[in-house]
């Protein structure tokens, strides 16, 4: 029997890319590939890329440049670029980096076996189509090998919102939702492999409308179906749009015990002028009222958000409106970025904010968000939380897991095993994690 071929995958960007990388590795496993943690001994290298920000795209070209020596030493080494940079830039990748053998978009990776075979003959292969066939239907059922206690599961892809700053509609395509039975089957397979927590993924996941036995089902209805799976203890979902936060989903946060009290609900800005120019289709006030309704259903829910500062034509007054919104909502965690021009998006054609001013605003916003995050973490001290243990800690006898609220929790002298869901009393908080002790 010949030795297995080795596959190195490097993943950039969002959780969906993590999921896609897993599926690509499984797909190429049928061609005799096993994963390796280093590119040096790989027979094939795949970079699964992100195109949300300019720096993310440039990192890919920088990484490819580092493989030139490796390709010279191993001419048969196959190098591929997948994901959203592949979709957006296509042939340009091969022009800038001729060492690349194949380029595959996020809707085409089910065809990787055929692409890999063609690349093995010396042919340059490009596949960035939006095929009519459903890639999930073409992917093989996931393997039965044991895995860690948490998993991502893509249920929806693409976006129809066309925010003025965003490339997702162009790189991932229109919104599509997977049929309910396919999602449930994959979830059951994951639970059989040891998974106890599943995070449902979508670029606009709460717009989910997958086909069910009696017509399309909402995300809330899908969650209630997942709730019936024995052995699945926790359900999360990300990322959501405020306009698709429907009543039944809000209600599920208050009544479904498996749905965790954590919600990532980006707002991007607090100025109605900027929100309109972003094409967000909601106002700051409607977002705040929505948060109030969600907290009425689940008072202890932790809200997470995304923010962009320095969006074209943003004034100091506009930025102050964002700070005001942050102070009113009080986020448990949030992600903030300086606006990054993406070619082909409407915002790229508008008057840009001075970079130094944008940097200053980002620092000021992050200071407020960091304070709020620490206040929320400090409020956990003394509470008893459920913790799903995921890995051993850095110190002997230490275990690390995630709380209901997605905080990392470190427990010393811990007899819990990976995959155990235990009650923990929080005894202290740090900058990015909590420390606790087992109470059962």
Curated annotation (Swiss-Prot):
Monomer. SUPFAM superfamilies: Radical SAM enzymes. It comes from the Bacteria. Binds 2 [4Fe-4S] clusters. One cluster is coordinated with 3 cysteines and an exchangeable S-adenosyl-L-methionine. It catalyses: N(6)-dimethylallyladenosine(37) in tRNA + (sulfur carrier)-SH + AH2 + 2 S-adenosyl-L-methionine = 2-methylsulfanyl-N(6)-dimethylallyladenosine(37) in tRNA + (sulfur carrier)-H + 5'-deoxyadenosine + L-methionine + A + S-adenosyl-L-homocysteine + 2 H(+). Catalyzes the methylthiolation of N6-(dimethylallyl)adenosine (i(6)A), leading to the formation of 2-methylthio-N6-(dimethylallyl)adenosine (ms(2)i(6)A) at position 37 in tRNAs that read codons beginning with uridine. Keywords: 4Fe-4S, Cytoplasm, Iron, Iron-sulfur, Metal-binding, S-adenosyl-L-methionine, Transferase, tRNA processing. The keyword Iron applies. This is tRNA-2-methylthio-N(6)-dimethylallyladenosine synthase. GO terms for cellular component: cytosol. Its cofactor is [4Fe-4S] cluster. [4Fe-4S] cluster 2 binds at residues 159, 163, 166. Belongs to the methylthiotransferase family. MiaB subfamily. Its EC number is 2.8.4.3. It is found in: Cytoplasm. It comes from Ruegeria sp. (strain TM1040). InterPro entries: Elp3/MiaA/NifB-like_rSAM, Methylthiotransferase, Methylthiotransferase_CS, Methylthiotransferase_N, Methylthiotransferase_N_sf, MiaB_methiolase, rSAM, rSAM_horseshoe. GO terms for molecular function: 4 iron, 4 sulfur cluster binding; metal ion binding; N6-isopentenyladenosine methylthiotransferase activity. [4Fe-4S] cluster 1 binds at residues 14, 50, 84. Residues 145-378 form the Radical SAM core domain. Residues 5-121 form the MTTase N-terminal domain. Residues 378-440 form the TRAM domain.
């Amino acid at each position: 029997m010949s030795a297995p071929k080795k596959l190195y995958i490097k993943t950039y960007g969002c959780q969906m890319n993590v999921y896609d990388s897993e599926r690509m590795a499984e797909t190429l496993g049928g061609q005799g590939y096993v994963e390796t943690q280093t590119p040096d001994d790989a027979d094939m290298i795949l970079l699964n890329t992100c195109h949300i920000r300019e720096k993310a795209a440039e990192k890919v070209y920088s990484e490819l440049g580092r493989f030139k020596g490796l390709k010279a030493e191993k001419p048969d080494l196959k190098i591929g670029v997948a994901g959203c940079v592949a979709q957006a830039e296509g042939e340009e990748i091969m022009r800038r980096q001729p060492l690349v053998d194949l380029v595959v978009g996020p809707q085409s990776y089910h065809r990787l076996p055929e692409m890999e075979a063609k690349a093995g003959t010396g042919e340059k292969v490009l596949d960035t189509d939006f095929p009519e066939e459903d890639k999930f239907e073409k992917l093989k059922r996931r393997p039965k090998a044991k895995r860690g206690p948490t998993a991502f599961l893509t249920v929806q892809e693409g976006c129809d919102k066309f925010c003025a700053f965003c490339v997702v509609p162009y790189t991932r395509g229109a919104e599509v939702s997977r049929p309910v039975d396919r999602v449930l089957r994959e979830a059951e397979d994951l639970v059989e492999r040891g998974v106890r927590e599943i995070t449902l993924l979508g670029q606009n996941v709460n717009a989910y409308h997958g086909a069910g036995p009696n017509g399309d089902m909402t995300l809330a209805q899908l969650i209630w179906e997942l709730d019936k799976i024995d052995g699945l203890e926790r359900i999360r979902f990300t990322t959501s749009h405020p306009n698709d936060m429907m009543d039944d989903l809000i209600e599920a946060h208050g009544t479904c015990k498996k749905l965790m009290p954590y919600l990532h609900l980006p707002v991007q800005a607090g100025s109605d002028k900027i929100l309109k120019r972003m094409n967000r289709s909601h106002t700051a006030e409607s977002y705040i009222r929505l948060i109030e309704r969600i907290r009425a259903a689940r008072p202890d829910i932790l809200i997470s958000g995304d923010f962009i500062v320095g969006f074209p034509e943003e004034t100091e007054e506009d930025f102050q409106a964002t700070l005001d919104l942050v102070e009113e909502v009080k986020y448990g965690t949030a992600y903030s970025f300086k606006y990054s021009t993406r070619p082909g998006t409407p915002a790229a054609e508008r008057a840009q904010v001075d970079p130094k001013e944008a940097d200053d605003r980002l620092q000021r916003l992050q200071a407020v968000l960091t304070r709020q995050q620490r206040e929320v973490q400090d409020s956990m001290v003394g509470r008893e939380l459920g913790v799903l243990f995921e890995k051993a800690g850095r110190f002997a006898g230490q275990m690390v897991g995630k709380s209901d609220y997605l905080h990392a929790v470190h427990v010393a002298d811990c007899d819990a095993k990976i995959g155990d869901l235990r009650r923990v009393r929080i005894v202290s908080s740090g900058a990015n994690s909590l420390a606790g002790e087992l109470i059962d």
